[in-house]
Amino acid sequence: TDRCPRLIQAYLEQPGSGEIGTGPILRAAFEAGIRIAVPVVDTVEPGRMRLVGWDPDTPLRPNRFGIPEPDSGEDIDRMDVDLWFVPALGAARSGARIGHGAGYYDRILAGAPGFKAALLPQACLLDHIPLEPHDVRLDAMVTESGVILPYL
């Protein structure tokens, strides 16, 4: 239908990080015929990520942070992503997010369309997280208890 995303972006969780795994989401999206993009740390522009296409047969290797990423793949324009699954160590009901502190997701999400959702345990929802001017707000937090839409 017209409400189904045509292209999703999902992180590949860093082993031992406590991030919620995205494997089941990726497999279900692939089986539904939805295109999938995953992030790759850019080796040309420090502090930036780019997106590449992914399917279940895509070979992965750990990057310098230990995060699995494809060796290669079709470059995907971030402006084409309909739904972003963003990693979070914590989030507030305001839509503020705590990541790993390097700003990679804030940079790639800045100005990008698409619905931005974090996957995290309910216990990692916080009352308040201060926002910096460069921080990008989430549109939703998805926990084992349900979906939380931020208040503004």
Question: Language model features by range: what are they?
Answer:
Residues 1-79:
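N-terminal active-site beta-alpha-beta segment that forms phosphate/nucleotide-binding
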Residues 44-152:
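Conserved phosphate- and dinucleotide-binding cores of soluble alpha/beta proteins
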